[in-house]
Design a protein with these regions (language model features):
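Basic side chains
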Residues: 2-3, 230
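Carbohydrate-active catalytic/glycan-binding domains of CAZyme proteins
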Residues: 20-230
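Sec-dependent N-terminal signal peptides
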Residues: 3-16
Length: 230
């Protein structure tokens, strides 16, 4: 009986590793802060893929990078990952002018992505975690999980954005369709979002401060950064 049980365990483990591997991305690719999500493949309805979103650590002298990319794999084969390309860069104003004379894009940190339904259609929102002054609360929208994502909360000046998000934002759609946002550095914040903007507080609600104790506060937790509802 013990031998039979051991054989079952071995076969189970072998079956798992037959469909997965580590490292799962090429050694030249660097995506820390990864958030994996399972979304329906827009090109193969009824099939699902795992999409990896994260900061793109390709700057030699700074954290993260000036673009965000996504890799994906079929849920049935986690050994074959596909590069789906650059999904977002922040380098131009709303009317297409470069932010800076040297046309360098903004550095983007750990992002988050959410899927929701709008008018019967799947929509994806990206919090790219842009920390450049005036664009910290940036949010972008796409009708595909692999982008491209377009900024959807420009101010009237066309170069800054509006909203409540701060450092390391996360966004979450509950089963009842209500949307929530989370962010913070040393202290944690959260709020129910207005579904018409996806970046402002829902009317009649307030920002919740210190959702859990921060790293400089007394309490069971020591929140520092990287809000996530995962």
């Amino acid at each position: 009986m013990r031998k039979l049980f051991g054989l079952i365990i071995v076969l189970t483990v072998c079956g798992f590793y037959a469909n997965a591997q580590n490292p799962f991305l090429p050694l030249w690719e660097h995506i820390p802060d990864g958030e994996p999500y399972v979304f329906e493949d827009p090109d193969k309805p009824g099939s699902f893929r795992v999409y990896i979103y994260g900061s793109h650590d390709n700057l030699r002298t700074h954290y993260c990078g000036r673009d965000q990319v996504v890799w994906s794999a079929s849920v049935d084969n986690l050994r074959e990952w596909r590069y789906d390309g650059v999904i977002f860069k922040s380098e131009f104003t709303q009317d297409g002018r470069p932010f800076t004379p040297d046309t360098l894009a903004d550095v983007l940190y750990a992002p988050d992505v959410m899927e929701c339904i709008e008018n019967g259609r799947k929509v994806y929102y990206l919090c790219p975690n842009n920390q450049v002054g005036g664009r910290q609360n940036m949010i972008a929208k796409s009708y595909r999980p692999d982008g491209p994502f377009e900024v959807c909360n420009w101010n009237d000046d066309g170069r800054t954005t509006y909203g409540i998000f701060g450092f390391d934002p996360a966004i979450f759609c509950d089963d009842d369709g209500r949307i929530y946002g989370y962010w913070g550095f040393n202290r944690s914040f959260g709020a129910e979002l207005d579904p018409t903007t996806m970046c402002t507080v829902k009317p009649g609600t307030d920002i919740v401060e210190d959702m859990i104790s921060g790293c400089k506060q007394e309490g069971e937790f020591r929140f520092f950064e990287a809000s996530s509802m995962r």
